[in-house]
Amino acid sequence: MEKSQLESRVHLLEQQKEQLESSLQDALAKLKNRDAKQTVQKHIDLLHTYNEIRDIALGMIGKVAEHEKCTSVELFDRFGVNGSE
């Protein structure tokens, strides 16, 4: 290849690199949190909260079932709730 062709190719590659770096910066700016450990910890915290709420709800359903002299499964069926939800 001639020197001018190589220089032209280098110039095109530099432009492509700048475009890719710009795209990367745009993508990184859209991320709410770039720290994976922090994201995982937030998900774990949310799962703990979900489990606490679910446990309370199941306890309350158990109390209602006891009061109505039926099973929790019967209450789930009555209200159209899948027991695994």
Curated annotation (Swiss-Prot):
Keywords noted in UniProt: DNA damage, DNA repair
Keyword Repeat listed: no
Keyword DNA repair applies: yes
Residue intervals passing through the bilayer: none
GO BP terms in the entry: DNA recombinase assembly; DNA recombination; DNA strand invasion; double-strand break repair via homologous recombination; gene conversion at mating-type locus; mating type switching; meiotic DNA recombinase assembly involved in reciprocal meiotic recombination; meiotic joint molecule formation
Recorded family membership: Belongs to the SWI5/SAE3 family.
Protein's recorded name: Mating-type switching protein swi5
